[in-house]
Regions:
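P-loop (Walker A) phosphate-binding loop of NTP-binding proteins
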Residues: 26
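Interdomain motor-coupling "hinge/lid" segment immediately C-terminal to the ATP-binding subdomain
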Residues: 120, 124-229, 262
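Accessory nucleic acid-recognition modules appended to NTPase machines
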Residues: 183-342
Length: 403
C-alpha cells in the first residue's frame, strides 16, 4: 500500500473519539485502502491488537440480501466483551437502514467506527437525524498530482513535473491504474468499467432508471462541456435538436443522480458584486479527467477544460469551497474560500495572445481586495507578478504549499 497521508492524518486525528468517521467519494477512489491504512496505523502507533478490529465490506455477495437487523445482530455478536472494538464498515450504503445500525452501535457499545460509501445518500437527512453532532465526514478524491507522481515513481522513472502534467491530464488519478505500468488503453478500460458499474449500481439500479439511453446522452453532453456554464434547459434544447426530446425536470434529475454518485461536482456561480450564489448557469466538473476520455475518447482540444477540472479538484481536496466568480462583464474561473482565507484563480492553457492576456488579468484586476490572485498556465516560463497577480505554471501550483 502506498500511503495517502493527506487523508489518513486527518482521519487519525479523530481516532478513539466518539465521532463516527465517514469516508465518501466516487467508486475506486481509494476509500477501502485508506481504511486498511488506518487499521495499520492503529496497530503500529497505538498498539491496538488485530482481534479488536472488525472489517466488513458490504458490496460483497456475502451480504447481498442482508437486512439492517441482521447487520446489527452480526456485528453485535462480534464485539469484544471487554474494552473497545474498532469497526471498519465498507460500502455500507448497500444495506438499507444502515444509519440506524451505526447509531445503535455508537450509542450502546464501546466502539470506534469508520465507514465508507460511494453515494451521497451517505450524507442524507437520514444520517443527520440519527447521528446529529456525532459524525465527521471526509471527502476522498482520486490521486492529486503530487500523489500521482509518488505512485508512478514506485515502478517507473518519473519525468520533470511540468512534463508529467500532460500524462496526468490524460491518465487521470484512479489509484488502481497507477500501481503498475498500464498503457493508456488499459487505464481507460479500467476507468470505463468504474464508470459503467457506477452508472448501473448507483444510478440505474438504485433509482430504477428505465431510459438508460437518455441518461447516457445527458452524461456525454455534460462530459463534453466540462468547464462551460450551462443549464438543464440548454441540455434539453440540445437533445431536442437531435430529435431526442427530454424535459428540463428529467435533465435536472439525471444531473442530481450523477452528483449523488460522485461522478460530477456542481460548481455554482457567485456574484462578486451582489455577494450571493446564483441559481442558474452552473458549471460541472468530473470526479477524474480519465472518466471523460474513457467514455468519449481522448481529444487534444479538451485539454484546456481538463486542466481547469484538475485545478478545481485540487482546491476541493485542500478544503476550499469553490465557486465560479461572476464579474460585471465576465467571470473568474474560481473563487475559493476556506474559513477566513480566499483566493481567486484563472486557468488558461496558454497565454499566446494579447487578447488572452488581457482577458485573464483584467478580470482579476476588477477585484479590489487583498486576497491572493493567480493566473495559471502551462507556458514553460510562467512566473512573476503583475500588479499583485501571481502567474504560475499549473504543475507548480498543484505541488505548491502556499495556498
Amino acid at each position: 500500500m502506498i500511503d495517502r497521508p493527506l487523508y489518513v492524518d486527518k482521519i487519525m486525528a479523530y481516532a478513539d473519539t466518539p465521532f463516527v468517521k465517514i469516508l465518501t467519494g466516487v467508486r475506486r477512489c481509494g476509500k477501502s485502502t485508506i481504511l486498511k491504512m488506518i487499521m495499520e496505523r492503529l496497530k503500529t502507533e497505538r498498539n491496538i491488537p488485530a482481534e479488536r478490529m472488525i472489517s466488513c465490506r458490504y458490496d460483497s455477495m456475502e451480504f447481498e440480501d442482508m437486512t439492517a437487523k441482521q447487520m446489527y445482530a452480526q456485528l453485535k455478536e462480534r464485539l469484544c466483551p471487554d474494552g473497545k472494538t474498532y469497526l471498519f464498515l465498507d460500502e455500507v450504503q448497500e444495506i438499507r437502514g444502515w444509519e440506524k445500525v451505526v447509531n445503535s452501535l455508537a450509542s450502546d457499545f464501546d466502539v470506534d467506527l469508520y465507514i465508507t460509501g460511494s453515494n451521497s445518500r451517505m450524507m442524507s437527512s437520514e444520517i443527520s437525524t440519527y447521528l446529529t453532532g456525532r459524525y465527521v465526514s471526509f471527502r476522498i478524491f482520486t490521486l492529486s498530482f503530487s500523489e500521482y507522481l509518488m505512485f508512478r515513481s514506485k515502478f517507473t522513472t518519473v519525468g520533470e513535473p511540468k512534463a508529467e502534467l500532460a500524462n496526468y491530464v490524460r491518465l487521470g488519478g484512479f489509484p488502481a491504474t497507477h500501481l503498475q505500468a498500464f498503457s493508456q488503453d488499459e487505464i481507460y478500460t479500467v476507468v470505463r468499467d468504474i464508470y459503467n458499474s457506477t452508472i448501473f449500481s448507483d444510478i440505474v439500479k438504485r433509482n430504477q432508471v428505465r431510459k438508460i439511453d437518455q441518461l447516457e446522452r445527458v452524461v456525454k453532453y455534460t462530459f463534453n462541456n466540462v468547464g462551460n456554464t450551462f443549464s438543464a434547459k440548454s441540455i434539453a434544447d440540445y437533445l431536442k435538436a437531435e430529435r431526442r426530446a427530454l424535459d428540463n425536470e428529467t435533465v435536472y434529475s439525471y444531473l442530481e443522480k450523477l452528483e449523488k454518485a460522485y461522478l460530477l461536482h456542481r460548481c455554482s456561480r457567485y456574484d462578486l458584486q451582489g455577494k450571493e450564489i446564483l441559481k442558474t448557469q452552473e458549471k460541472f466538473y468530473l470526479a477524474d479527467t480519465a472518466l471523460r476520455y474513457s467514455v468519449l475518447g481522448y481529444n487534444a482540444d479538451s485539454v484546456a477544460s481538463s486542466l481547469e477540472n484538475i485545478v478545481y479538484l485540487e482546491l476541493c481536496r485542500r478544503g476550499y469551497t469553490v465557486n465560479v466568480g461572476k464579474t460585471s462583464d465576465g467571470e473568474i474561473d474560481f473563487v475559493a474560500v476556506r474559513q477566513n482565507e480566499k483566493i481567486y484563480v484563472q486557468v488558461t492553457q496558454e497565454i499566446n495572445s494579447e487578447k488572452t492576456e488581457k482577458r485573464e488579468y483584467e478580470r482579476l484586476l476588477e477585484i479590489h481586495d487583498n486576497y491572493p490572485k493567480y493566473v495559471l498556465t502551462t507556458d514553460e516560463f510562467a512566473g512573476g507578478n503583475y500588479e499583485g497577480i501571481k502567474t504560475m505554471h499549473i504543475a507548480d501550483f498543484l505541488l505548491s504549499s502556499e495556498y
